[in-house]
């Protein structure tokens, strides 16, 4: 005798791993997007009502990596030095690369449409970013410095690194919006491993998913000026633009990266069990064949 899955309600507990590609969906100026990877773990509870409908809630832990790069970039800005004098600084960068590593916890709630071993899930997912680590690598940068009060152009200055070729790295943590709303979709196929032989049903579930962040993401403003400390001098190098993350930075009043969201595409694999065997009545009312 074979029992149809839709003949009775079923509770599923599912746990597994997922991973794939991440992309930052935003308009950029002078900046190149780069596909990167994400991955994580998930734990779900599903209630599958008789016939074809159900609901699923769960908990996910994710890590997203996002990358940007720029080539042959130039900009200028004004700042105030330690003597309260205005400095006009122009700089060029041969290449720059930034990476963002974001850890987050998600709470999805999805409607389930299923037929036999196939299932389609759609619903919202609330995401809480935990940590966002940022790393910036600058290669072959050069500066020129001008003091307008004295009409003095600094052609060579070791403490200011004027007219020098240098490279550097900067790392710190950024703050993202505390709550993000995502739309989570998923398509699965379930392989039955155990069919009530031990009073529970078990599955291996494989699937593909597409998640899109509906909340515009931008990093919280950081310090307006950071100092690069040179190894053999006590003076610092004021690099406001170089030490500003790309997703915060402006060039002549225009943001390099517009506020945007992430989207993920990937695959998942899970082990699931239905811990409660259907009541006896289910065997008499289900659609079945055989003896």
Predicted feature residues:
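Transmembrane beta-strands of outer-membrane beta-barrel pores
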Residues: 19-25, 61-65, 115, 126-132, ...
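Short loop/turn motifs that connect adjacent beta-strands in outer-membrane beta-barrel proteins
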Residues: 8-12, 48-55, 192-206, 276-290
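Transmembrane beta-strands of outer-membrane beta-barrel proteins
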Residues: 11-17, 53-59, 105-107, 118-128, ...
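Outer-membrane beta-barrel proteins
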Residues: 25, 43-51, 113-117, 187-197, ...
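Extracellular/periplasm-exposed beta-strand and loop segments of Gram-negative cell-envelope proteins
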Residues: 25-34, 64-102, 129-180, 216-264
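Hydrophobic h-region of N-terminal signal peptides that target proteins for export
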Residues: 1-9, 184
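Short glycine/proline- and aromatic-enriched beta-strand/turn motifs that initiate or cap beta-hairpins
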Residues: 8-48, 270-276, 289-291
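Extended serine/threonine-enriched, polar tracts that run as long, contiguous segments within proteins
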Residues: 164-165, 173-195, 201-205, 209-218
């Amino acid at each position: 005798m074979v029992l149809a899955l839709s003949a009775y309600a079923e509770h599923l507990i599912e746990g597994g791993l997922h991973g794939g590609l991440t992309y930052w969906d935003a308009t950029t100026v002078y900046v190149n997007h780069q596909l990167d990877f994400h991955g994580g773990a998930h734990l779900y509870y599903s209630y599958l009502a008789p016939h074809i409908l159900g609901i699923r809630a769960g908990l996910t832990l994710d890590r997203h990596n996002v990358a940007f790069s720029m080539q042959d970039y130039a900009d200028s800005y004004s700042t105030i030095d330690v003597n309260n004098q205005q400095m006009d600084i122009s700089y060029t960068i041969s290449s720059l690369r930034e990476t963002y590593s974001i850890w987050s916890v998600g709470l999805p709630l999805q409607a389930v449409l299923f037929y036999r071993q196939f299932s389609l899930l759609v619903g919202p997912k609330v995401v809480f970013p935990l940590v966002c680590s940022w790393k910036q690598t600058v290669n072959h940068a050069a500066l020129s410095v001008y003091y307008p009060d004295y009409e003095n152009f600094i052609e060579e200055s070791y403490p200011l690194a004027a007219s020098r070729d240098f490279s550097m790295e900067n790392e710190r943590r950024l703050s993202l919006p505390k709550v993000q709303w995502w739309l989570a979709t998923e398509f699965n196929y379930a392989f039955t491993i155990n069919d009530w032989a031990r009073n529970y049903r078990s599955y291996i579930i494989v699937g593909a998913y597409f998640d899109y962040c509906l909340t515009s993401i931008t990093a919280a403003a950081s310090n307006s000026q950071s100092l690069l400390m040179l190894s053999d001098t006590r003076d610092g190098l004021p690099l406001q633009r170089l030490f500003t993350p790309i997703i915060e930075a402006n060039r002549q009043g225009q943001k390099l990266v517009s506020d945007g969201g992430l989207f993920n595409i990937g695959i998942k694999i899970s082990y699931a069990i239905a811990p409660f065997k259907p009541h006896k009545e289910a065997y008499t009312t289900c659609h079945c064949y055989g003896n």
